[in-house]
């Protein structure tokens, strides 16, 4: 898939929580085809501490507005700078990078989208595309507390939403794999993104129940093009660069001890 380096215009900066910001970026021409699960690498600036581009999952794509959304956790100097951008600013982006989630071949296929923390980001776009193709996605979203649950209104517009929080402030108490919906219903496909322990738990559930499952890995990366090899993941097919062979991989490819 062809990649582009473009200056995109910031049209909106919305603080979703003290730690999370939603940037909406507009291109001056039609966006390329973007598969749910792909990501961008953004250039913060050219100072030594933030010289390397930051990989950010694509949260949503609005083709009518030539706009893409980036949901960002402000955890370091680079991402905190992104949170300080103003509408009208320019952000240099390399995109679309990596692969994406496999879409259901049948609109009747029962698909579960499991996200934890800011790992929910690519699932909004995925759920939108699944619904657009005639499907009805089910979301299972987890967080430590209700304040960490993001974009719930948007998810509720796309399908059913089930929630867990560790402190029981919203939804069922506990982790996503403890939610009662997993005991009550059967799913044929799972897509998940979030903290690695959560994804491993989801993968364990999927394997035990013979469910096709893909995970979106969040390995640290730099170039986004498979050249620097800092994002390598060991698989049963050899070493794979998460930035080019991923970030989405089938759990049967992984060497996780689950």
Where are these regions (language model features)?
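Short, basic/aromatic-enriched C-terminal tail that caps enzymatic domains
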Residues: 1-4, 239-258
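Ferredoxin-reductase
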Residues: 2-87
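Structural signal for conserved beta-strand scaffold positions within catalytic alpha/beta enzyme cores
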Residues: 12, 60, 163-165, 215, ...
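Short, Lys/Arg- and Gly-enriched loop/turn segments at beta-strand edges
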Residues: 48-56, 98-105, 243
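FNR/FR-type flavoprotein reductase catalytic core
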Residues: 77-218
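Local cysteine-cluster metal-coordination motifs and their immediate loop/turn environment
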Residues: 218-247
């Amino acid at each position: 898939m062809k990649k582009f380096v473009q200056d995109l215009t910031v049209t909106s900066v919305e603080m979703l929580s003290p730690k999370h910001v939603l940037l909406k970026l507009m291109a001056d021409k039609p966006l390329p085809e973007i598969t749910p699960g792909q990501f961008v690498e953004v250039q913060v600036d050219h100072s030594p501490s933030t010289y390397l581009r930051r990989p950010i999952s694509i949260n949503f794509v609005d083709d009518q507005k030539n706009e893409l959304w980036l949901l960002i956790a402000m955890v370091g100097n680079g991402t905190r700078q992104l949170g300080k951008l103003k509408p009208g600013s320019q952000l240099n982006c390399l995109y679309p990078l990596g692969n994406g989630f496999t879409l259901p071949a049948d609109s009747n296929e029962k698909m579960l989208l499991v996200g934890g923390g800011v790992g929910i980001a690519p699932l909004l776009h995925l759920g939108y595309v699944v619904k657009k193709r005639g499907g009805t996605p089910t979301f299972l979203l987890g967080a430590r507390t209700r304040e960490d649950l993001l974009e719930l209104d948007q998810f509720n517009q796309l399908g059913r939403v089930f929630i867990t929080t560790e402190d029981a402030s919203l939804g069922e108490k506990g982790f996503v794999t403890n939610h009662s919906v997993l005991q009550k219903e059967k799913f044929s496909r799972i897509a998940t993104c979030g903290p690695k322990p959560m994804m491993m738990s989801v993968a364990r559930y999927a394997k035990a129940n013979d469910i096709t499952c893909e995970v979106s890995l969040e390995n640290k990366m730099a170039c986004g093009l498979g050249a620097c090899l800092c994002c390598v993941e060991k698989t049963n097919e050899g070493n794979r660069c998460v930035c080019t062979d991923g970030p989405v991989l089938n759990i049967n490819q992984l060497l996780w001890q689950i």
